[in-house]
Structures are given as structure tokens and as C-alpha cells.
Amino acid sequence: MSSFNDYFEIQNVENLLPTLKLCKQYFFKNKQDSIVNNNNYNNNNKNNNNNNNNNNNNNNNNNNNNNNNYINSCNSNNNNNNNNNNTKNNNINSRTDKNNNGDNKFNFINEIVNNNISTYTPYNILNSCHGSSLFEIKPQPITCKDIN
């Protein structure tokens, strides 16, 4: 398997947020077994509706009914990044693009660290902008204890 930065076009990812390195370590600890390339990911049981088009996503809508965490790490032009959430959904925007309706605050990591969330669950979907593929990480709960 390639490294984290081979999948995601992020420059100096460790400098963006100190905690990201810890989370990256946790997510990709067993990446050979846990990352699955799903070109046409459509699972109604998890209620994930993803518009994962190429490098130009004008309307990237994530409608979630579960605890799903989306990592957008593309070099693309996203004009409308709309997240309709019924539960705890967090966006990590770690890209170097024009993003009119987004931020680069790493909400997912900030919530773990600052709000002392005891457990983080289910699926983390990674949008890579490489051939419109989705990379799925199998469920691994994250706790503050794990990253502290």
C-alpha cells in the first residue's frame, strides 16, 4: 500500500494541526487490511449519500443519519459543501482550494480534543479526488484516552 500522502494531496499535513498526526497514526495503523477502494459505494443501511464527482464539486452534499465523519482532502473547487446532519457528523477540510462555504478548522479533531468526547464511532469516508474513488476505513472507535 502507498503512504497516506500518496492517497491525499496534502502538503505538510503534520504542520496543519499537531493532533492530526496522532489521528492519522490511528486511522492508518492497519491500512493494508482496512482501506477498501469502492468506486461505486452505495450502502443504504449506513445512509451515506455522497456526491463524489472529480476535482470540481459544485454541490458536495453529505446527508447522514449515523455517526459518519467525512474527510475532504482534495485540491478542488468546492463552492457549496453542504452537510445535513441528524447526528454527530464532522468535516475535516484539509485542502488548498477555493472553498466558499467551508473552513479549515478540523472540527472532527477539535471535538475529540477540546470537547472531551469519550468515544467516536463508525465509518470514516475519505474523498480523495483521485478518479472519484471512496476509501473506506473499517470501524475503529476512537477515545480521548487513545490520542492523549
Curated annotation (Swiss-Prot):
Residues 37-99 are annotated as: Disordered. Residues 37-94 have a biased composition (Low complexity). This is Putative uncharacterized protein DDB_G0288037.
